[in-house]
Amino acid sequence: MATPQISRKALASLLLLVAAAAAVSTASADDVLALTESTFEKEVGQDRAALVEFYAPWCGHCKKLAPEYEKLGASFKKAKSVLIAKVDCDEHKSVCSKYGVSGYPTIQWFPKGSLEPKKYEGQRTAEALAEYVNSEAATNVKIAAVPSSVVVLTPETFDSVVLDETKDVLVEFYAPWCGHCKHLAPIYEKLASVYKQDEGVVIANLDADKHTALAEKYGVSGFPTLKFFPKGNKAGEDYDGGRELDDFVKFINEKCGTSRDSKGQLTSEAGIVESLAPLVKEFLGAANDKRKEALSKMEEDVAKLTGPAAKYGKIYVNSAKKIMEKGSEYTKKESERLQRMLEKSISPSKADEFVIKKNILSTFSS
C-alpha cells in the first residue's frame, strides 16, 4: 500500500512548529546574553538591534520577570537581527548609570547601529515583549507554549494522583485571579522541573476557584494554600514554609529523602546510605583475605534495605566487588571515567545514574 505523501509546505510548517516548541521548552538563562562593562558596546549598537534588561539579583520584580524574559530569549535565539540581553547592575554599575537606569527592572530597546535607547513601557510578559520586538525589528517570532512539569489536578484525577501511597505529593490550591498565586506560579513551575526525574515526587496544583467542593473538603480558605500529602499521611499536612525556590527544595529534600539543588542537579549526598558507612569502613580496613567476609556482611545488610536505599545498596556491593577484582585503583579510575561522561551531552536520567555511582564510590576512597 502506498505511503501518504506530505507536501513540502506542510512538512516545513511542521518542522517550524517542532523547532519553536523545542527552543522554548528548553528556555534557560543561557538563552539571554549576559553583558558586562567590557562587552556591552561590542554587542549592542552593532549590526543587530538589542533588547536589554537592566536588573538587580535581589529585586523581586526582576525575579518575577526572569522566566518570561528567558522564554523571550529562547524564542529569539535564532533571530539573527535581534539580540536579547541583560545587565546585572549590581556588578556593572557604570553601564547602568550611563544609560540612566534608576530602578529595576529597566528594559531598553537599542536599534541596529545605535547606542541611543528607547525605554520599554509595556507589560512584562514574554508575549508582550515579543510583540514589541517584532514591531521594532520587523521580525515575526512567536512564543510557543512551554510544556509544564506541574501535574494539573481535577476532581476526576485528584484521588488517583494525590492519594497514591507510592508518591509524595505537594499540592497548590490556587485561584487564577489571585496575585500571590501569579507570583508563585514561575517558582512552582521551577520546583516541578527540579523534581521531574524523581518518580516518587509529584508537584501538582488544583484550580480551587473552579473546583470549590474539593478545595472545601481539604479546608482551603485562602489562596494559594499548599498542602503536602506524603506516603504515610494521605490526610495531608499544611505547608507553612517560605515560598522561594530554595525553601521548597529544602522542604522536599527533607520530607522525601531526595538530594537535589535548586537547579535540579543531584547533590553530593545523593545515593549515600548512612547505615552502610560502618560496613564500608570495615571492608576498606580488612586485609585482602578478609574482604570477602566483610563483603558478605554488607550483602546481608543491603538485603534488608527497602525503597531507593535498596537500589543504592546494590551499587555499594558492586563497587566492593570491583575493588576486590581490580584493586584499590578501581575507585579513582572509575570516578574519573564517570566525571568524563558527566561532562558530555547525556540524558538527565543518565546524569543522575552517574552522579549517584560517583557519590557512592567516593565513600570507598575516604
UniProtKB/Swiss-Prot annotation:
The record marks 243 as: Lowers pKa of C-terminal Cys of second active site. The active site is at 59 (nucleophile), 62 (nucleophile), 178 (nucleophile), 181 (nucleophile). Its main location: secreted. InterPro entries: ERp29_C, ERp29_C_sf, PDI, PDI_thioredoxin-like_dom, Thioredoxin-like_sf, Thioredoxin_CS, Thioredoxin_domain. CDD domains: ERp29c, PDI_a_ERp38. Acts as a protein-folding catalyst that interacts with nascent polypeptides to catalyze the formation, isomerization, and reduction or oxidation of disulfide bonds. May play a role in storage protein biogenesis. This is Protein disulfide isomerase-like 2-1. It comes from Oryza sativa subsp. japonica (Rice).
